Amino acid sequence: MVRKKILNPDRVRRIKGGFSFIPHRFVTDGFMSSLNGSELLLYLFLVAVSDRYGLSFYSSTTICKLLEMTSGHYQKARQGLIEKDLIDFNGTVFQVLDLPASLGVHPAVGNLFEEV
């Protein structure tokens, strides 16, 4: 068993105010590797800004500005996350969803559509 030692005890993360998390399954079950760069950036942003129910209200204009993403890349990324069952969107509000039981798209397939 690996013994863990805190590298910098003065800078240990603590939960203060808002807090978000990404389940370990996001990495180990291949969800992360199924996303292209824009999808991953948008997903991480939505996780970081969402409330405890996974809801966020950022407009597409604000998201594109903050992520330095074109409207086209944003729309493709949003649609990709919806198709992979990671988020829901009603035109105004985003919801980051609990991870599905399995990937809807094989990890290698997601990377085929990455922007140039």
Segments from the language model and where they lie:
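Short recognition helix of helix-turn-helix/winged-helix DNA-binding domains
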Residues: M1-G54
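Acidic/proline-rich low-complexity IDRs
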Residues: K5-I6, R11, D98, A108-N111
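Short, structured secondary-structure boundary patches
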Residues: F19-S20, T28, R78, V93-V96, ...
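Charged/polar, solvent-exposed surface patches and flexible loops
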Residues: H24, S33, K65, K76, ...
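Residues in flexible loops and secondary-structure boundaries
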Residues: G30, S34-L35, Y43, C64-L66, ...
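Winged helix-turn-helix DNA-binding recognition segment
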Residues: V49-S102
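Short, amphipathic alpha-helical interaction segments positioned at domain boundaries
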Residues: S102-V116
